[in-house]
Amino acid sequence: MAIPKHFDRSILISHLHDQFWSQEYYLAANKLKDWKATKGTGWAKDLFRKIDEVDSDVTQEKREVLETNASRRLIKSYFRKTQQFCSRGFLERGDLSEHLAMPQRLSMLFEIIEVFEYAREPDYNREMFDFYDDLHRVQLFRPGR
């Protein structure tokens, strides 16, 4: 797909910025941080084990599992979408490092989302995580590196 000659990236950056700073993102991030903080070692694998146990009888614990997984998927989708816009030429790497993927935001990606990916499948696709790692390599702690 050809990018229009006068494509204005600022509209796309503004939209993505609004997503990353939304109440929805904030609530999802807090849900994931709470899960990690309260589930002890094995917190990432525990989510997927409990997802497999969910049936039609939805208890408070099962609801928490489903909400936590929805939060994981939402945040991962924001990062994936932003990375794809960059890799397809709609955004430049500088747009991400300056506006959308500051080091403090990437800690959620590396310290929680990537750990979930590894727990689900040790041979997970690292492309998106490597992409963001390259933006701020020196400044970030990445357990999966």
Regions found by a protein language model. Name each.
Residues 1-49:
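Membrane-proximal alpha-helical anchors
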Residues 43-61:
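Aromatic- and Gly/Pro-rich amphipathic surface segment
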Residues 60-145:
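An amphipathic alpha-helical interaction surface
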